[in-house]
Amino acid sequence: MNKSNLNIKNKTPESVVEVKDLKVQFQLKDKVIKAVDGISFNINKGETIAIVGESGSGKSVTALSLMRLTDYSGGRIVSGEINLQSKKNFNLNLTRLDQEKMRDIRGNDISMIFQEPMTSLNPVFTIGMQITETIIKHQGKTKKEAFEIALEMIKLVRIPEPEKRLNQYPHELSGGMRQRVMIAMALSCKPSLLIADEPTTALDVTIQAQILDLIKMLQRDIGMSVMFITHDMGVVAEVADRVVVMFAGKKVEEGTAIEIFQNPKHPYTRSLLAAVPKLGSMIGKKLPAKFVNLDVKSSDEHKNKEKISTKKVVEMKDTVNRTSSPLLEVKGLTTRFLIKQDFGRAGGNIHAVENISFTLQPGETLGLVGESGCGKSTTGRSIIGLTSPTRGEVFFEGVDLTNLNNKEMIQYRKKMQMIFQDPFASLNPRMTVGQIIAEPIMVHGLEPKLGSNSRVIKLLNRVGLDEQYYSRYPHELSGGQRQRIGIARALALEPKLIIADEAVSALDVSIQAQVVNLMMELQEEFGLTYLFISHDMAVIERVSHRIGVMYLGEIVEIGLRSQIFENPQHPYTKKLMAAVPIADPTKRKKKLNLMNDEIPSLLKPIGYEPEYVQMIKLGEDHYVKPFDGMKLQN
C-alpha cells in the first residue's frame, strides 16, 4: 500500500482516534444547518468515551462523521480532521479518504451500532448471511468458519435458540433481538473502535445490563475503544471513563465521568443531570409525581444562567376512584400464536400471554413492566382487540369484550385508545397532522368535517402544540412532537382508557419528561385511566399507582408502587431492580452474572397446557407468584 496516499498524520501513540475542530453542515433550500460546529476530542486505546446531549445536539452526526456516513445523508465535513490509528498501524486522516478506502475501515477498524436495528438490517437476507458477510470480507474466513463465528457471537449476546435465529429474517425477531443481532455483527470483526449510537435505548434493563457487560468484556479482551452516543445518564455513569457534553453542535463541557457527575461546571450539564429520572426518588410518596422539565432554548441562554432550578418531587392529585366498579377487569387472559413449519404443518404455540388477571379503577395508572418478549405489549393489544386472545375475559365497564362482534365493538373502541412506541411508524406519512387527528373523529361521526377543524386545533393546543402544526406532515416533526400528535389522536375520541405501549422509551430525558408530565396532567383533567407499558423502571415508578411485573407471559408480582419498589418479593422483580443503571459513577455495579442466564423459549408443543399456579396474597393489593426457595421478606 502506498503510504503517500494515506494522508498520514503524526498522532499521540495511545490515541485511537483524534478529532480536531470538526465542522459538519447540511445545506437546506433556504439555510445551512451547522450540525457539528468545531468539536475536538480524542479517544484512547481501551477507553470508553460518552458523547451526551439531547436530540439535535449533534452527537449522532459526530458519530456518523467518524464513519463518513454523513456523505450519504446530505451532510458535508467543511473543515477539521478525524485521525485514526488503524489496525495496520497507519495514521489516517479519515476526512481525506475516498469512500472506497472507507469501506475497508468500516466494520474492520471502526464498527457502529445504530439505534434503529430494523432500518439497519437488510430485510431480504437472513441474520446469518448478514453477519457472515462482514466476517468473510474483513477476516478472509470461509463460509463455514464465518458461520461458526457468527453462531458464537449470537450466543454471546444471549439470543435464545441461536442456530434457528441465524436462518431467520429480521422481521421474525423482536426489537430487542434485532438490536442484539446488530451488536453481534458490529463486534464480529473485533474493531479498534466501536461506536454505539443509542444502542440500548429501546432495550429493557436486564438486556441493557447484559449488553453493557458484553461490551466491557470484549473491550477488556481485545483492547477495544468505545464511543457511546446516548442521552441515558445512567448508562453514561455505568460505562464512561470520560464524558463530552454537546449542545447545539458544540462541546460545552468535557471531563472524567466522576467530574461531570459530581461537579458539573456548565449550566446545561447541571440541568441535563437534574432531568434524569432516578430510581428510588418516589420512596415515601403515595401518588405519582411529575418530572423536572428541562427547558432549553439556546446555548447563549444557558451560558448566561448562573443557577438551574431543581424542583422537588411534587405529587399529583389523587385521581383514582376507589369506590366505583373497575373500569377494566382482566380474567385469565391467554394469548398464543400458532407457529407453522414447512408445508404449513403446526410447529407449536408461542405462549405470549398466559392466564393473567388484574383490574384497573377509573383514574388509575397500572404500570406493566418486564423484559422484551415477556408479553406486556401483547397484553395491551389483546385488551384493545388488535390481537385476538386465545381465551379469557376482558370486562370493560362490566361488558366482556371477548364476546362482542366487530359491530358491537365499535361503541367501545372509541372509549379505549392506544399510544404506540414508534410515533413515526404509527402516523400516516401521506396525511397532515390535522388529517391524522381528525380521522378518528370523522370515522366515528362525532363532528361534521367543518366542525372537526376547531376540535383538532383545541387538541393540538392541549398537547402543547400551536395551530401552525395543523398542516405539517409527520416527517417535519421531531420525535417528541410526533408523540404529542399520537397523544392528541388518542384523545380525539375522549376515551376513558389509554394503553401507552412504550410511549416514551425512545425519547431523550427532557422530551420524555414533557410527554410523561403531559399525560399526568391529562389524567388529572379528564380522569383518564392508563395501562402504562414500559421497560423503564424509573419512569414506571414515577407515573404508576400500581405495578405488575411480567415474566415469560405471566404476571409474577403485582401491587402498589411502594410495595413493588420498596419491598419486592419475586426474584425476577429484584433482578429488574438490580439491573437499572444508577446515574452515579461511584456506584457502578460489578458484573451482574446475567450473561449465562438461559432465556426459556415461549414456544411450546401443540396441546401443552402449563400447570395453573395461584398467586399468594402478601398484603392489601400485593400478590406474588410462588417461586423456588420462596422465603418472603417483610
Language-model features and meaning:
Residues I77-L92, G392-D400:
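Conserved ABC transporter NBD signature motif
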Residues Q85, E145-K164, V399-D400, G451-Q468, ...:
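Conserved ABC ATPase "signature" region
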Residues Q168-L173, M177, Y473-L477, Q481:
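Conserved ABC ATPase signature
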Residues M67, I384:
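Helix-to-loop junction immediately C-terminal to a conserved catalytic motif
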